């Protein structure tokens, strides 16, 4: 059964009517082609209206869609000869992060990303895409290996956040995230990051220090979930929709604020509607990003990355004179 989002219910009802009429026409000697054509035209108009006016909360729902493509879905479509590497060489192998070496249009690269499950069993195995410290240390190990061999790094970001459990804290969750931020800032190879779903807090940032950071059109990137923000601000997690409106978590907002570099368009209705087509959109942006970064020397890459993050958070003070009575 198809998973339907809250704002898509009018579309689901209309599609159901069209399907019923087609089925009735197929088994009865009755022609409903005019009615079907009218309903299909109405459906197309309604789809255009809905998807052209998505609210931040609508985009949160799309980013969390259970069928939304994962890192491994994109690896399968964008890379060849992918060889997954395991373990952080300190504690264990965290399956909430996948990474390895691959070829991207013939170019050797290292690709790393958060990985959610496709069903309950896999989600439990991958901890719902929320990494432990060993996941971030595995990612850093692969990044330093990529630096050693001169391979560009491509990171896919999709997590609610780093796992906040007791064991993760005991093994140094905050240190692992901080270490990744520090080390990624100084990598001497090109780093391109793409937010493909949810970009949650430090758990996302630990894979997000790149020369370019891009976001899929319906992905989100924030310091906290809308539910968490609502619980803190208004003591009521049910006000998540209100929080989403004010948090500036969408790709459009973050592009305007200079946090990300480019918005990658999604197929209408969300990336889950056509993964192959969505991969092509990502491919176009990755190719262009690497084409711009590959000619740069190590010092230039580090300087460009430094300037990018130095500008985030800039503000302009108002010059308006205010008289005090």
Curated annotation (Swiss-Prot):
It catalyses: N(6)-carboxybiotinyl-L-lysyl-[protein] + acetyl-CoA = N(6)-biotinyl-L-lysyl-[protein] + malonyl-CoA. The keyword Lipid biosynthesis applies. PROSITE patterns: COA_CT_CTER. Keywords: ATP-binding, Cytoplasm, Fatty acid biosynthesis, Fatty acid metabolism, Lipid biosynthesis, Lipid metabolism, Nucleotide-binding, Transferase. It is found in: Cytoplasm. Gene3D superfamilies: 2-enoyl-CoA Hydratase, Chain A, domain 1. GO terms for cellular component: acetyl-CoA carboxylase complex. The keyword Transmembrane helix does not apply. Its main location: cytoplasm. Its EC number is 2.1.3.15. Pathway: Lipid metabolism; malonyl-CoA biosynthesis; malonyl-CoA from acetyl-CoA: step 1/1. InterPro entries: Acetyl_CoA_COase_a_su, ClpP/crotonase-like_dom_sf, COA_CT_C. GO terms for molecular function: acetyl-CoA carboxylase activity; ATP binding; carboxyl- or carbamoyltransferase activity. Residues 35-292 form the CoA carboxyltransferase C-terminal domain. Component of the acetyl coenzyme A carboxylase (ACC) complex. First, biotin carboxylase catalyzes the carboxylation of biotin on its carrier protein (BCCP) and then the CO(2) group is transferred by the carboxyltransferase to acetyl-CoA to form malonyl-CoA. Acetyl-CoA carboxylase is a heterohexamer composed of biotin carboxyl carrier protein (AccB), biotin carboxylase (AccC) and two subunits each of ACCase subunit alpha (AccA) and ACCase subunit beta (AccD). PANTHER family: ACETYL-COENZYME A CARBOXYLASE CARBOXYL TRANSFERASE SUBUNIT ALPHA, ACETYL-COENZYME A CARBOXYLASE CARBOXYL TRANSFERASE SUBUNIT ALPHA, CHLOROPLASTIC. This is Acetyl-coenzyme A carboxylase carboxyl transferase subunit alpha. The lineage of its organism: Bacteria, Bacillati, Bacillota, Bacilli, Bacillales.
């Amino acid at each position: 059964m198809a998973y339907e989002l809250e704002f898509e219910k009018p579309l689901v009802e209309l599609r159901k009517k069209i399907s019923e009429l087609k089925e009735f026409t197929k088994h009865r000697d009755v022609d409903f082609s005019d009615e079907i054509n009218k309903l299909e035209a109405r459906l197309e108009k309604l789809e255009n209206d809905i998807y052209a006016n998505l609210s931040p909360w609508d985009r949160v729902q799309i980013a969390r869609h259970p069928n939304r493509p994962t890192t491994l879905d994109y690896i399968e479509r964008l890379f060849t000869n992918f060889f997954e590497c395991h373990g952080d060489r300190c504690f264990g192998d965290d399956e909430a992060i996948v990474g390895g070496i691959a070829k991207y249009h013939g170019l050797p690269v290292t690709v790393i990303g958060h990985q959610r499950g496709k069903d309950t069993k896999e989600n439990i195995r991958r901890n719902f895409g929320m990494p432990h410290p060993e996941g971030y240390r595995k990612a850093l190990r692969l990044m330093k290996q990529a630096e050693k061999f001169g391979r560009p790094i491509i990171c896919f970001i999709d997590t609610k956040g780093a796992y906040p459990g007791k064991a993760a804290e005991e093994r140094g969750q905050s240190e692992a995230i901080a270490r990744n931020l520090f080390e990624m800032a100084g990598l001497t190879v090109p780093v391109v990051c793409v937010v493909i779903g949810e970009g949650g807090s430090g758990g996302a940032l630990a894979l997000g220090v790149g020369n370019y950071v891009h976001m899929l059109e319906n992905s989100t990137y924030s310091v906290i979930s809308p539910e968490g923000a609502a619980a803190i601000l208004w003591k009521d997690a049910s006000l998540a929709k209100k929080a989403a409106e004010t948090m500036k978590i969408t790709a459009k907002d973050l592009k305007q604020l200079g946090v990300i570099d480019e918005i990658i368009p999604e197929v209408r209705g969300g990336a889950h509607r056509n993964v192959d087509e969505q991969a092509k959109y990502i491919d176009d942006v990755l190719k262009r990003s690497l084409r711009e970064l590959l000619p740069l020397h190590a010092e230039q890459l580090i300087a460009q990355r430094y300037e990018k993050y130095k500008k985030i958070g800039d503000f302009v003070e108002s010059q308006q004179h205010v008289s005090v009575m």
